[in-house]
Each structure stands twice: as C-alpha cells, then as structure tokens.
Amino acid sequence: QKNNTRYSAMKICTITCQNADNYGARLQCFALAYWLKKEGNEVEVIDYQPDYMREPNLWYIPSSVKELVKLFVRFPERLCSVKRHKIYSEFSKKYIPLTKVYNNINELRNDPPIADIYLAGSDQIWNPTFRNGTDPAYYLDFGPENVQRKSFSASFAVSSIENIQKKLWIKNNLKRFDKITVREQSALKILKEMGYDGELQDDPVFMLSAEEWNRALNLEESWKKLGIKNEKYVLIYDFFLSDEIKSVALEYGKQNNCKIFSVCHKSLSYADKNFVYADPVDFVNLIKHACCVISNSFHGTCFAMIYNVSYVIV
C-alpha cells in the first residue's frame, strides 16, 4: 500500500474504537496520534465510550434464577475481563492524549472538541456487523461544519455490505467527508459501489519504524520485566482459540525445537507460558523477540512484519 496523506501544523482530533480491549485497537490509536504529533500537529484522541464499548461490569442485578446462575458461572471470566480492561486503560492513560470522556453522540454534538481536522480511523470503525459500524460518531456527525473531515486507513472489515439498509445509511453518512482513505482494497470497492473515490492508506502502526516503536514504548526496559531469558519460542495470538492454530503451533514447536508462548485472552492448555494479562507494550515485545508468530489477527501480523519476524496466518 502507500501513504499519500500529509498533515502538519494543525489541531487534529482523531476518533477510533480506542476503548476496545484488544492490542491492535489501542496500538493503532497510539501510533496515529504519535505520528501526527511527530509531523508537527497538536493531537487529541476523542475518548468516546458508548455503552456498547464500555468497561465490563463485574456485577449486575440478575432478572431471574437462570441469570443468577449464569452470573456466578461466568464470574471468573468477568473478573478476568475487568482486570484486562484496567490494564488496557492504564496503557491509554500513559501513552494516548485523550480528550474528556464522551458517552454518546449527543454529548459529542453538544460539546464537540475544537479542531481544524476531525480524523476518523484507523481500524474497523465502519464494520457493519458491529454497532460502531452505524454509529454517527465514527462518521464525524458532530462539530462545526467548517472543520475538515477525513478518514485515515478506515476499515469496513468485510468484502461487501449485504444489508441494503445499512449500506444506504453508510453511504449517506460518508457525504460529509472531505477525503476518505481506507485500509483494504475491498474497502475501495465498497466505496466505489457507493459512488465515492477513496485512497489506500497503510495502517498507522506502519507509520513508525521498529526503532521508533522501541523508543516510544521503551521496549528494552519493559522486556526485562517479563523475565524471559534466552528462550526460543513461537508466539500464539489467537482471537478465536482455534484448533487449527493449535495444530500448527504444536507442529512448528516440535520441528523447530522451541517453546509455545500465548498472548491470548484465555490460557491455552498446550502453551508453555500464557501471558493473559500482558499489556500492549508486552504484546509488542513478545512479538519482537519471537522466532515466529502464529495468528489470525491483522495487527499481530503487522507487528511481525515490522520486526521482520516469521509469521503464519491461519
């Protein structure tokens, strides 16, 4: 892909799914803000936290005996989710320049952040299978009309939008954009079907070199805290806990005489070490030092490429 987008000496507010609890969401958000600031801009990330993307509640009032049983059965899992959310949030507070919290589109419309440019992206902000895909906030439906509105490496995360009603809604809401850049060729096709011209734009994580990532996240110091010493390992980052990744990992570990480390949201029984509570900095470090990354994650693959680590996409 290519990068045709240049920004300098502007006040820019970006909006993305920065509150999602996964490594890619937080790291691409950080990378875009970091790069824009490096280009000489004043940058803030809109801290948009709609109800569907909020911190998981540890407790809630069950409406039936069935719900009560479900609450207790899933309590350990919910506890893990709350702990992970705290870890992700601490990363964002330390590394990402956030605005005040906005809980819904009305709050954004009533008190929009001041900026020269509103920038939507990156990541799956327009994914029509998720609620954010038809949330007006991610289509910049707020703020003064004279503010420039652009997207940066936005993704629909699908090859086509089959739901006609959603497709029409998205088409109408893209009208307010002055420029649209997207992450995938498939997104260009979707835009063309809607009558829009778009450009390909690399994901923000590629805007930083490996050396810049090392410095920006202080990786050398953080690596020491993980306590991994001279261990050869293949790293598993598996969104779906798939049997296919398991078989590939076991075979790779056997053939290459290396351990299996996991950085998934749940422990894997076949892994030698599980880093369930790794923060985004640990995630980058674990990829950087791996002999191979086996994943079904876009950003897992991206960081393997950045650090020139072998990878297998499953």
What are these regions (language model features)?
Residues Q1-A9:
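Short, Lys/Arg-enriched N-terminal segments with co-localized hydrophobic residues
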Residues T16-Y23, L27-N172, L219-S222:
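Aromatic- and Gly/Pro-rich donor/ligand-binding loops
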Residues W35, I190, Y252, L286, ...:
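Hydrophobic/aromatic ligand-binding patch that stacks against planar heteroaromatic rings
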Residues A115, F177, A290:
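An anion/phosphate-binding loop that grips the pyrophosphate of nucleotide cofactors and donors
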Residues L119-K166, Y196, L200-K273:
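Active-site donor-nucleotide binding/catalytic segment of nucleotide-sugar enzymes
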Residues K171-R176, I287:
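A conserved, positively charged/aromatic
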Residues F177-E184, I294:
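A short beta-strand/loop micro-motif in the catalytic core of glycosyltransferases
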Residues P280, L286-V314:
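A donor-sugar binding/catalytic signature common to diverse glycosyltransferases
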